[in-house]
């Protein structure tokens, strides 16, 4: 077994935990989410010294969701849990972050290395002496593991994990045994900031791919740009915006790409999701002779049940690790460098005018005297109320699909979990996002269904504790609407117990730091949206938004029907 480095040989000795937390602060992390446990307590003592804020969540699952939301606004996040019981509680959230390319550094406090070596029968174990079993469980949902068991390699493992987390935009796992927390290592390397730059593409290969792309782009008569989630996750939005601006091409987003493009831009055409799209959007995208697809994730909920009608022969796919031109794939090529060179070398394109975007109310909704708040009326109306640079979070279900019809002001960030789709995610994510947004002076708005809210609403307590002021709309429609449309319309398992949502923040100790509203008609919601004090978000606000039980966005209905058919036929 390797011996520890003698402290006297270190030029700038520093404790392992301090090194780890200082690196996290260096890359922009300002708050750490998690739940304390006896194997991580001493490590948590280092947070104040490293100028990191401890959030302290109600449970590890919610903490994981919160870390996800924080990372989507801040760029990266950190989560601390304890061995076994704590880390396993967070795994659903970590899996979602892995699925959706969200960079979280998951730090797990572990028992003393000698206890592990001796196979002691400790609490939080399976009782079989295997102390690596939980690490193995995390391996498939982490892009790298950093097991800090020896001072000789600790700094390298920490630096590598943080860099991989950033570059690959996925969670990493760092185990920190109790005896390693206070061990001394060389701190001199902290004087050199981590290199978080992407590995450069091979210049010759990159130039060849750019030439191929430009050949098809200049030959196309009706090219369009389609932007999706991985353009956001892999940080190519500057390149995308420059491409959109310089090319003048009609530009659309997939549902997971909402917010990736300035929706007030003259080139912006709307959300393309196959059969769930606005008819004009669908016609323009599907009649195009060249789709420049940037960061696509073609999942079922992102495509209205795999209903894309665009062929690969007319598509160029840009991704973080490859570019695919029609049926030819070019591996080990990052889209960032390729997009930069395309913009530099593109020149003028021969394209026609872009159709003006529209998310106006449907004619039947404009003429309606109905007072019930329907999805067809709600979501375009929300777009008229939102502010520039808002952070808008939507829960899996009606909100996730309804937001497709909301036209965002400039600079709005959208957060949802379309691929992983864990109900309840949005509440924890709202806490994390609101914390990061507060640091940026931005407003946070959450739309969550009543069923999903019941899973994770403890994090409203954490919002109150951290003086966060999100505006929370709870869509009250008597249960799991998305699941009713898939199967079991009248089934009791899709029902929920009605809760008095407006009094929950009071039970959590909000007192004078909270305002609640109950809205049942369109006029009441119009009045609330016109209330300047409400819009200024002076404190945490919760709105019970009552909607018909059987109403849902048309895109959700189509997707649910597709899911039901697959469940029966596969």
Swiss-Prot record:
Family matches, as InterPro entries: DHS-like_NAD/FAD-binding_dom, PDC/IPDC-like, THDP-binding, Thiamin_PyroP_enz_cen_dom, Thiamin_PyroP_enz_TPP-bd_dom, TPP_enzyme_TPP-bd, TPP_PDC_IPDC, TPP_PYR_PDC_IPDC-like
Key word Metal-binding present: yes
Gene3D superfamilies: 3.40.50.970, TPP-binding domain
Binding site for pyruvate: 38, 124, 483
GO cellular component terms listed in the entry, alphabetical order: cytosol; nucleus
Known cofactor(s): Mg(2+); thiamine diphosphate
Any Pfam family: TPP_enzyme_N
EC number: 4.1.1.1
Binding residue positions for thiamine diphosphate: 398, 421-423, 451-452, 477-482
Chemical reaction(s) catalysed: a 2-oxocarboxylate + H(+) = an aldehyde + CO2; pyruvate + H(+) = acetaldehyde + CO2
Enzyme class (EC, first level): lyase
Key words, A-Z: Decarboxylase, Lyase, Magnesium, Metal-binding, Thiamine pyrophosphate
Gene Ontology MF terms in the entry: magnesium ion binding; pyruvate decarboxylase activity; thiamine pyrophosphate binding
Manner of cofactor binding, per the entry note: Binds 1 Mg(2+) per subunit.
One GO-annotated biological process of the protein: aromatic amino acid family catabolic process to alcohol via Ehrlich pathway
Binding annotation for Mg(2+): 450, 477, 479
Assigned protein family: Belongs to the TPP enzyme family.
Subunit structure: Homotetramer.
PANTHER family named in the record: PYRUVATE DECARBOXYLASE, PYRUVATE DECARBOXYLASE ISOZYME 1-RELATED
Protein's name according to its UniProt entry: Pyruvate decarboxylase
Organism: Aspergillus oryzae (strain ATCC 42149 / RIB 40) (Yellow koji mold)
Gene coding for it: pdcA
